[in-house]
Amino acid sequence: MSRYYSYLNTAENILQQYRGAEPFAIFIKKFFAAEKKYGSGDRKMISHLCYCYFRTATLFPDIALQEKLVKGLFLCSDQPSDIISLVHPEWVDMLSKSPKEKLEFLACKKNLADIFPFISECSNDINPEAFAISHLSQPDLFIRIRPGFEKLVPEKLEKAGITFRQINESAIAV
């Protein structure tokens, strides 16, 4: 249990230290290089919390940083999260809902420009609401399957419990 609060505290610490002088990916890599106590799972979760914060922080300007982290995680996740289960167990049933439904659940009345500030610069062919809300989801990662491994790769992903979409014979979206 305290591990999850440690994740929140560490993410909060990282965000307070970050000044924007360098790309965040480089900054957080240096942070973890200096702090050897974090394993790969810890680094992954803490990084995810930080990136969720960057996607959603402008939606909640008047709340504490740690609560922004939790709300960001809630909005950007569709899988069960131990942090959400611990901090806001009443939100667990909403995790599988769409980002738009989650925003309504949190009673967030913000403008779409608060998610993506350059919405007015988009072409008319782009649906501004769908485009802004798409920033709350992690984009797919595409895997190219080499010839001869068309059956092996999907089997290994299924065995590992990783959900994926078969795009064609040689491509998978994770």
PLM segments and residue spans:
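Class I Rossmann-like S-adenosyl-L-methionine
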Residues: 1-174
